[in-house]
Amino acid sequence: MSILSIVLTGFGLAMDAFAVSVAKGITLTRVKAKDALKVALFFGGFQALMPLIGWGAGRYFADYIKAFDHWIAFILLGFIGGKMIFEALKEEDEEKAEVAVSMEVNKNKEREFANMKRKEELSAKNLTVLAIATSIDALAVGVSFAFLGISIVQTIIIIGIITFVLCFLGVIIGEKLGDIFKNYAEIVGGVILILIGINILLEHTGIIEKLFS
């Protein structure tokens, strides 16, 4: 397996993580470099770790994972995406029911809410769930690496770096999109996650291939 093939594989595996990173950037306000760095580290780290686990597990484990990996990704992404949409709609209803208060109080509440939302979106638990969901494919691919006679250390470093860079940029790009979508940012982010989950499910069940064959 050539370096070029490994790089292309890395880009392919990183696409879901990149899309989720864009969704993260959309739902966050005033993204800081450390926010993008945290997301990139989680996604890049898991994208490198999963192939290593798969490589160590062997061919037998590959058959086991392939049977349900798409369902795991679909359920995790669908749940997180649905939760984001539900919370966004709930917040919108609550805002309509609130009595008008002074502009200064509103600004303080918005800042408090933004800080609380940032902590939730960037929590280790939240990022771990998303990182696992978007790196399950890498686990299955990693199993095949065991039979290709390649340097697994070099391979996972390349894959990890590619994912890290793409996800860092994804968060920044997402923030710019968030300025456009404004109040609908979290709904858009949730929809993106659900669509990614559906895409993974359709690809692995062969439905997309049948539709375009």
From Swiss-Prot:
Question: What domain of life?
Answer: Bacteria
GO CC, one annotated term:
plasma membrane
Record keywords: Iron included? no
Report the transmembrane regions from the record. Answer: 3-23, 36-56, 67-87, 130-150, 152-172, 187-207
One Pfam family name is Mntp
Provide the topology term for how it sits in the membrane. Answer: Multi-pass membrane protein
Per UniProt, subcellular location reads as: Cell membrane
One of the record's GO molecular function terms: manganese ion transmembrane transporter activity
Major location category of this protein: membrane
The UniProt entry, under InterPro entries, shows: Mntp/YtaF (IPR003810), Put_MntP (IPR022929)
Q: Kindly state which keywords UniProt assigns to this record, in alphabetical order.
A: Cell membrane, Ion transport, Manganese, Membrane, Transmembrane, Transmembrane helix, Transport
Q: Which family does this protein fall into?
A: Belongs to the MntP (TC 9.B.29) family.
Function noted in UniProt: Probably functions as a manganese efflux pump.
Supply the name of the protein. Putative manganese efflux pump MntP
Q: Which species expresses this protein natively?
A: Clostridium perfringens (strain SM101 / Type A)
Its organism's taxonomic lineage begins at: Bacteria, Bacillati, Bacillota, Clostridia, Eubacteriales
Question: Quick one: which gene encodes this?
Answer: mntP
